[in-house]
Structures are given as structure tokens and as C-alpha cells.
A protein has these predicted regions:
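Membrane-proximal interfacial segments on either side of biological membranes
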Residues: 1-48, 59-246, 255-312
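Short acidic-hydrophobic surface loop/beta-edge motif
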Residues: 52-54, 150-152, 250
Length: 312
């Protein structure tokens, strides 16, 4: 209208819409829109959509927006809910299709909205980790998102997380702390039980193939087969579908069981060389060699007898 003011009521049923801003693009189907546009006053719009794609892929968006055209900066008040968002479409992980819901509301100039909201997911499955009932807080400021107080159930325990994510570069960093994780679930080994505490980090430079996770862990007392232990310590590294553990030490009554590496690949446990280390002398011997001869401190047969005595 060549700069002329608008004062109209608008209604759209089952439409299609394309939106572009900076490096972001969105293609939206089944659009229903109604509201009032007044370029000399306050405009309000309500929009509800079906599936959308582009920079982010999901099942639907519902939004309310109020824009004040009386001021040059176009101060706005918005509330948005995006349902069924696929994490992989945002660069969050490789081939992750568990769906999340993002809800946010905020205000500010239309070109620089600052919003607060929540993220929720019924479940999230990533290589070697299964999260349930994910819920946390988000803060959005000009393409930068921060996550805080995110909680989820993982392997019978609780994991809390915080992090940051950039919509345009898709660079993100996530910091995790977990407590009470049941070792039997990820290893799929009922004979190996303890409750694990872990601290970890996940980093991505924008290319999901470069995603890396690492951290350290410790555990309460537990048992492997019939052998009890006081606790486990070690570090881990996760890339793609392989979860690697390094410098793992198991503290037992008869010595320290140590391995430089064992791996969980596609859900299967692969053990490396395991050594039995005497706490006093530091002498090490492989478990295989210790089976039929004196190992560090004791022979394996004596260990078994000790276990039987404790049980009886």
C-alpha cells in the first residue's frame, strides 16, 4: 500500500506460510491465523499451524503476538509453543528423533525479543543414555538459548543439566550431573550392580559428526557376579554409538581391579584387559593369570572361600 496505514481484520484458514529471518527459514503448513492489524496502533495476532520445517522441524506451532506500531522499535509481547520438535533438525545430536515441546513468552523490540520458557520431553534416547521425563527452563535472547535446571530420570537415577545453544551456528555445550544411576541398565548385565554418580560434558561445534561427550564417574559399593566391591571410579568418552570407559578402578577387599578400557558398543559390553593390583605392594597381575596361582595378596580360590563364609 505504498506506505499507507493499515487497519484491517485478518482471517486465514488452512493456509501455507514461509518465513525468513537472518539464516533462519521456516515453511509452515495448515496455517490458521486471525487477528487485527493496525499500523497506527496496537496489533494482535493468533496463529496455529500444522507441521513445519526448515531451520527447525516439528508438529505444530501456536502463538499469540501483540505489536505496538506507535513506537519505532515495535515493542511486542509474544507467547509461543512449538510441539513435536525434532532435536536432530536443530543440530542437537545425530539421528535423534524423540520429540520435544518448547514453550516461551517474552517481550521487547520485535527484532530482539527476550523470552523465558520451558523445554519438555517424555523421553530422549541418545547413544548409551536413555532419559525420561525431561523438563527444564530456557532463556532466549537474539538466537542464543540457555538451558538451566533441566532434570530427567536416567537408569533409575536423576540427571540435572545446564547448557547453551545458538540457533544460527548450532554450536552447543551441555553440562551434566547424575546421581543414583543403576549400572545394570546400561551394561545389560544383571550380575554387575552399583549406583553411579557422574559428571559429564557434551560439546558440538555445529557439526553433529564432531559431537563429543566425556566426564568422570564414581559409585557406591556393589557386586559383580558373586564378588562384592567398595566402589568404582573412572572416566568415560562417548562418540556416536560407542561409550568408552578408561582408567577404571574397582576397590575390593582383596585388592584393586583395574582396566584401562572397556566399551559399550550398540548396547553390548566389551571388556579389555583386567588386572588385580595389590593395595600394599602395587603388584599387578591379570585376572586370567591369577585364577590358578597366587595373585597380589591372595589367590582367587581363597577369595571365593571368603565370599562363601560371608554368605553363610
Amino acid at each position: 500500500r505504498e506506505g499507507k496505514p493499515l487497519d484491517v481484520t485478518i482471517t486465514v484458514h488452512n493456509g501455507r506460510m514461509a518465513a525468513f529471518y537472518r539464516q533462519r527459514r521456516y515453511l509452515v503448513s495448515r496455517v490458521s491465523l486471525n487477528g487485527h492489524i493496525d499500523t497506527r496502533g496496537v496489533s494482535d495476532l493468533h496463529i496455529k499451524t500444522g507441521e513445519f520445517g526448515g531451520t527447525m522441524v516439528g508438529n505444530g506451532i501456536e502463538a499469540d503476538c501483540e505489536i505496538d506500531f506507535k513506537e519505532k522499535s515495535l515493542p511486542s509481547i509474544v507467547s509461543v509453543t512449538a510441539k513435536g520438535v525434532i532435536p536432530s533438525s536443530m543440530g542437537l545430536g545425530d539421528d535423534i528423533h524423540d520429540k520435544m515441546t518448547l514453550t516461551a513468552s517474552g517481550r521487547g523490540p520485535l527484532s530482539h525479543l527476550i523470552c523465558e520458557g520451558t523445554v519438555t520431553m517424555p523421553e530422549l534416547h541418545v547413544p548409551a543414555l536413555d532419559f525420561y521425563d525431561v523438563k527444564g527452563d530456557i532463556h532466549y535472547d537474539d538466537g542464543a538459548m540457555t538451558f538451566s535446571d533441566v532434570k530427567a530420570r536416567v537408569y533409575g537415577g536423576i540427571v540435572t543439566a545446564r547448557g547453551d545453544y545458538n540457533v544460527d551456528s548450532r554450536v552447543y555445550n551441555i553440562y551434566l550431573h547424575g546421581e543414583g544411576l543403576d549400572s545394570r541398565i546400561p551394561t545389560k548385565e544383571p550380575r554387575f550392580y552399583c549406583l553411579v554418580t557422574l559428571d559429564g560434558e557434551i560439546h558440538c561445534d555445529g557439526n553433529v559428526k564432531d559431537l563429543v561427550a566425556f566426564g568422570s564417574f564414581s559409585s557406591s559399593g556393589g557386586f559383580y557376579s558373586l564378588i562384592p566391591f567398595r566402589g568404582i571410579t573412572g572416566t568415560f568418552h562417548n562418540r556416536y554409538r560407542a561409550l568408552d570407559f578408561y582408567d577404571v578402578t574397582i576397590d575390593t577387599d582383596f585388592g584393586l581391579i583395574h582396566t584401562d578400557a572397556f566399551h559399550i558398543i550398540d548396547g553390548k559390553l566389551h571388556l579389555g584387559k583386567i588386572e588385580l593390583v595389590d593395595k600394599e605392594s602395587g603388584e599387578a597381575m591379570s585376572i586370567t593369570d591369577a585364577r590358578n596361582q597366587k595373585g597380589p595378596g591372595r589367590v582367587i580360590s581363597q577369595i571365593r572361600e571368603d565370599i562363601k563364609e560371608r554368605v553363610s
